[in-house]
A protein has these predicted regions:
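FAD/FMN-dependent oxidoreductases across multiple families
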Residues: 117, 136, 214-318, 324-326
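C-terminal helical "tail/cap" subdomain of flavin- and related membrane-associated enzymes
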Residues: 317-401
């Protein structure tokens, strides 16, 4: 039997980074990567400036650095943001491969086999798992880093209710024939959530993120197609018509082209409610959950890569110090407050304010006020948290325009 100190199921950012840090610290680590080779994670691929500053080695992965972004209100009003601190957009194939290779180079055993939670069994010395190819491995600690649909997470911490999940779906489409493609985030009209267009080195990732309990596939898919067509067609004014149903020959030709060339994807994202954070337990004496498997994603934006990497780092520090159960208190102290505050803000962020969507008013105000615009840019880039967001916005708004 193959024996290890830790068995990590899932080789996304959380699992691979944990494997790297633990192996560097002297632990014997098995990292199980059950995803078919070349199959990308369904994700926009955005990595915040906060993450890039915390782990500058991420800049060595092949990606695109973003210094400016166009933010659109539900009615189509545009706010152009020039970011003080850039963020990056990666192909998840390239990004995940980069982190997995670092884990392997650090001494972790990377095993390209799928693991079912049903085949993970507790023993007197820890855990035994049997892979899809009937290979058997044992370890003292079992780590679930297998994403939002985590089978390990359901086994160890229980299933999350649908209200604690979000849905993201979209298309990978060709880059425009000419010009520099803009990075765009557009808040949805009459829906919770937003659409995005994230240019990567060889394609554009289009998508929509919304809550699972509000999800209706056909109307949202229609909305995404309107957004995609509006993205490729040049705007006639500063108010881009993303959400209009265009039937002119140019739009129809573009639709046919995208139907033939675009590749669809879909995923679930954790978006835990405030009350869930009060009771959710994500580690024990011989197990722990990381990243999306633990529920660590921003409930407002769905961003999870920073929390995947940070949870991996916090867990590795606890384990290497011989205090694995400290992980529960450490993550709550480190970033739990931000996640809870985001959960509390989600309804208001996508609610109404002064007779219009809050996102509409926010962009209107930022278009006329440099201080508010700067804070909004910091929020988008990941440098501005939610805990002191209200105070920062009020302070900026009171300063002269």
């Amino acid at each position: 039997m193959n024996r290890f100190d830790l068995l990590i199921v899932g080789a996304g950012p959380a699992g691979s980074f944990a494997a790297e840090l633990l192996a560097k610290g002297g632990a014997k680590v098995a990292l199980f990567d059950g995803r078919p080779e070349g199959e990308p994670k369904a994700c926009g691929g955005g990595v915040t400036s906060k993450a890039l500053k915390a782990w500058p080695q991420l800049l060595n992965a092949v990606g695109r650095t973003i210094n400016e972004l166009d933010l659109y209100s539900p009615s189509g009003k545009k706010l152009h943001l020039e970011l003080d601190e850039p963020f990056a957009i990666y192909s998840r194939i390239a990004f995940d491969s980069f982190l997995r290779d670092r884990a392997r180079d650090s001494g972790a055993a990377v095993i390209g086999e799928k693991v079912s939670a049903r085949k993970a069994k507790r023993t007197h010395g820890g855990w035994t798992i049997i892979t899809e190819n009937n290979s058997e491995y044992s370890g003292h600690v079992l780590i679930g880093a297998d994403g939002a649909n985590s089978g390990i997470g359901k086994k160890l911490a229980g299933a999350l209710p649908p209200s604690d999940m979000e849905v993201a779906f979209g298309y990978r489409a060709p880059l425009p024939a000419s010009g520099e493609p803009p990075t765009v985030v557009a808040f949805l009209p009459k829906w919770v959530g937003y659409a995005w267009a994230f240019p990567r080195p060889d394609h554009i990732s289009f998508g929509i993120a919304t809550t699972q309990d509000a999800f209706e596939h056909q109307p949202l898919d229609d909305l995404l197609w309107q957004f995609m067509i509006g993205y490729y067609l040049p705007p006639s004014t500063d108010k881009r018509k993303f959400w209009s149903q265009r039937k002119d020959p140019q739009a129809e030709n573009l639709r046919r082209y995208l139907q033939q060339s675009a590749e669809r994807y879909a995923a679930r994202i954790p978006g835990l409610a405030d009350k869930t954070w009060e009771t959710r337990k994500i580690c024990g004496l011989d197990w722990a959950l990381l990243g999306d498997a633990a529920g660590f994603a921003d409930p407002v934006t769905g961003e999870g890569i920073y929390y995947a990497l940070r949870s991996a780092q916090v867990f590795a520090e606890c384990h290497l110090a011989g205090k694995i159960t400290d992980y529960e208190a450490r993550w709550r102290e480190d970033f739990g407050g931000e996640l809870r505050r985001a959960a509390q803000m989600r309804r208001r962020f996508y609610g109404n304010f002064w007779g219009a969507p809050f996102t509409e008013r926010m962009i209107e105000f930022a278009r006329g006020h440099r201080g508010v615009k700067r804070v909004l840019g910091e929020l988008v880039a990941g440098d501005q948290g939610y805990v002191d967001l209200k105070k920062k916005l009020v302070r900026s708004a009171l300063r002269p325009i």
